Amino acid sequence: KVELSTNLMLKVFNGGMDVAEEVLVELMDKMNIHGMTIYKAPSMECWKTLGHYEKEPGTQLCLSEEKYLARFDEHHIHVINNTASIAVEYPQVYEHFKQNNIGSALQFSCLLNGQLWAVFEFDIFGANRRKWCQDDISAIYSVVKAIADVYKKFYEQK
C-alpha cells in the first residue's frame, strides 16, 4: 500500500489536476473501494462522484458545520466503520448512506488557505461493513493530500 500510494502521489505531482480522476479511479480499484464523492464547500454540493451510486449523493450541507467537523481527527480524517452510528445525530447523511447501501465510509476534509474547500468521501457498498485499517487510511490520506496540494497550487495560479 505504501508503494501504491507513493506511485499515485508521484503521478498527481507530475500530471497535475489533469490526472486526478485517473488516480482516484486507480486508488479505488486497487483498494477495493466502491464509490467516491467530493463535496465542494461552502455549499457542500456533490462536485464529483466515481462508482455506481443508486442515488446521486446531492448536497450535504451539514458536512461543513462545526459540530460535524468536530468528528474529524487532527489530520482531518473521519472514519465511519458503521454508517448506522450517525443515524440519530445526522439523519440527512445517514439517509444518503442508506439510499446508496453504504455500510462504511471514510471522509477527509481539505482546507485551502485555512478554509474548508472540500470533503472527500470513500464508500464501501453493501451489508458487509469494512473496518478501515490504519494502512488503508494512511494510503488514501496520502493520495487525497497530494491532490489537495496540487489543487492548491492550481488555484493559486489563477
How would you name each of these model-derived features?
Residues C110-G126:
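Sensory-domain boundary capping and coupling elements
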Residues E56-K98, L106:
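Regulatory sensory and allosteric helical modules in signal-transduction proteins
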